[in-house]
UniProtKB/Swiss-Prot annotation:
ATP binds at T77, P78, A79, G80, E81, G82, K83, S84. Disulfide bonds: none annotated. This is Formate--tetrahydrofolate ligase. PROSITE patterns: FTHFS_1, FTHFS_2. InterPro entries: Formate_THF_ligase, Formate_THF_ligase_CS, P-loop_NTPase. One of its GO terms (biological process) is tetrahydrofolate interconversion. It comes from Corynebacterium jeikeium (strain K411). Pathway: One-carbon metabolism; tetrahydrofolate interconversion. The lineage of its organism: Bacteria, Bacillati, Actinomycetota, Actinomycetes, Mycobacteriales. Pfam families: FTHFS.
Length: 562
């Protein structure tokens, strides 16, 4: 998130602000969160993992469940609208208001950090720190997921090489390798070249780690045992007679789980304001389910009064998947939802006309209401915003019956979200556990089938009139039905820039057709991925990647991260 200051005063870069801040010892943050020493696994002085089984044992008999606040956004510009930044500033403001507070968000992917984003741990004076560590290697979770994914790929090819007892058809191997780098040249590759001793030649490819099934599994598993069961169910391909082959068939679920033994533990860090933050798991919302790990969220809810979490991009992507996939898997109830908006994005979605762009925000608010939750709109201020523009958004809020609260957390940190915290806490305090459980809900029932689910999402959330299945999607649908997988939740892979599958159709398009090109069974994760439009599961670098600005000096101090 860049330069969303409500003032025109020069401000240091995000990394300069983070490096100038004196971090509290992670033991102090753990104590503030109520995490006993026996459940803390330090990674240096400012990072740690939480041993969740040890924490549960230490807290046995303690019946505490916090209120969950979900932060989403309107359709973004390519630069993003500061959703994470607002969440972090809001969390600091809620803690300042006297509530025991925790943040539970995703960890950044190295690909976008080196690509277009240049960092993804908040911005300005609303950051999670140590930001350099979080944005680069952190505690190694991404590497563990990458290693697990590629080990499974190696096991598939090795089985084919050594007799192929399962009868795997190399032409129908669906398991792809992954890496945490934006590299378009690896989307489609041929492996096994070089002769009989080098493997069986076949077409394959790479996905970015954040889009891998093992990332999704890690983020939806409830514990290590559940993780291993889910990994065993991963479908890696088909036999010559079209039967599915799983990781369990390859007898490697235990080995893959062993690689993830430590990665399943949530990571504990802190905001600039000293609020404990669990940063764990990082599936993208446009090509995956877009939510942090279920283990981190439930752990935070067990420890705090108020937990703030986010779901990637807008109500049509991360928020929908939060309610329909993550919430369903973890039986989560949402007490309040914040929709982040900016004048910049309103103009972008209105072809430079702010008033026209309000239709986009209006649909996002309407979508959230369909999940049974009344949202608060957070208007994230920029120095370029005029009083007239801000007034127009406020007037729209009154007319549409939704509360709009301005915030300036990039420039002011938690102090810039004091009014927003008041508004959100009013909603949270007005919702009992019973109310949250009975009101927040999913928008479809998987038992109705994949076709019905996609039609519901297309018409109710995207504003579409119809769904069109391409030739490959129709074949995939038949395969799903043959194996009894057509009644799973659906994770739609779709552009984040539009309610349609066309990234150029900004605003609030309606009456369009959702084009589904493939249906991919992610049985370990427990859902079916619907690939739409031209979305790629391995991004490429832009013409001027953020990596060109990132540097490190002789003392090891990193610069160039936003």
């Amino acid at each position: 998130m860049t330069n969303s200051s409500a003032t025109s005063n020069p401000q240091p870069s995000d990394v300069e602000i983070a490096q100038a801040h004196t971090l509290e010892p992670i033991t102090t943050i753990a104590e503030r969160a109520g995490i006993p020493e026996a459940a803390l696994i330090p990674y240096g002085r400012t990072k740690a993992k939480i041993d969740v089984p040890a924490l549960r044992a230490e807290r046995e008999g303690v019946n505490k469940k916090g209120k969950l606040v979900l932060v989403t956004a309107m359709s973004p510009t390519p630069a993003g609208e500061g959703k994470s930044t607002v969440l972090i500033g809001l969390a600091d403001a809620v803690r300042t208001a006297g509530r025991q507070t925790m943040v539970a968000i995703r960890e950044p992917s190295q690909g976008p950090v080196m690509g277009i984003k240049g960092g993804a741990a908040g911005g300005g004076y609303a950051q999670i720190v140590p930001m350099e560590d979080i944005n680069l290697h952190f505690t190694g979770d991404m590497h563990a997921i990458t290693a697990a994914t590629n080990t499974l790929a190696a096991m598939v090819d090795n089985h084919v090489q050594h007799g192929n007892a399962l009868g795997i058809d190399p032409r129908r191997v669906t398991w792809r390798r992954c890496l945490d780098v934006n590299d378009r040249s690896l989307r489609h590759v041929v492996t096994g070249l070089g002769g009989p001793g080098q493997g069986t030649p076949r077409e394959g490819g790479f996905d970015i780690t954040a889009a891998s099934e093992i990332m999704a599994i890690l983020c939806l598993a409830t514990d290590l045992e559940d993780l291993k069961k889910r990994i065993g169910r991963i479908v890696v391909g088909q036999t010559y007679d079209r039967r599915p082959v799983t990781a369990g068939d390859l007898k490697c679920a235990g080995a893959i789980t062993a690689l993830l033994r430590d990665a399943i533990n949530p990571n504990l860090v802190q905001t600039l304001g000293g609020t404990p933050a669990l940063v764990h798991g990082g599936p993208f919302a446009n090509i995956a389910h877009g939510c942090n790990s279920l283990i981190a969220t439930t752990t935070a809810l067990d420890l705090s009064e108020v937990v703030l979490t986010e779901a990637g991009f807008g109500s049509d992507l991360g928020a929908e998947k939060f309610f329909d996939i993550k919430s369903r898997a973890g039986d989560l109830d949402v007490a309040a939802t914040v929709v982040v908006a900016t004048i910049r994005s309103l103009k972008h979605n209105g072809d430079s006309v702010l008033k026209a762009g309000l239709a986009n925000l209006e649909r996002h608010v309407s979508n959230i209401r369909k999940f049974g939750v009344e949202p608060v709109v957070a208007l994230n201020l920029f120095s370029s915003d005029t009083a007239a523009e801000r007034s127009m958004v406020a007037d729209w809020g009154e007319q549409f019956g939704v509360r709009v609260v301005e915030c300036s957390v990039w420039a002011e940190g938690g102090a810039g979200a004091a009014d927003l915290a008041t508004a959100v806490l009013e909603v949270v305090d007005g919702v009992s556990d019973e109310d949250a459980s009975s009101s927040s809900h999913q928008i479809y029932q998987p038992v109705d089938g994949v076709e019905a689910t996609l039609h519901t999402l297309a018409t109710e959330i995207y504003g579409a009139a119809d769904v069109q299945f391409g030739p490959q999607a129709l074949k995939d649908l038949a395969f799903l039905k043959d194996n009894g997988w057509d009644k799973l939740p659906v994770c739609v892979s779709k552009t984040q820039y539009s309610f349609s599958d066309d990234p150029s159709a900004l605003g609030a398009p309606s009456g369009h057709t959702l084009h589904v090109r493939e249906l991919v069974p992610r049985i370990g994760a427990g859902f079916v991925v619907a690939l739409t439009g031209d979305v790629m599961t391995l991004p490429g670098l832009p013409k001027k990647p953020a990596a060109e600005r990132i540097d490190v000096n002789a003392q090891g101090v990193i610069s160039g991260l936003f």
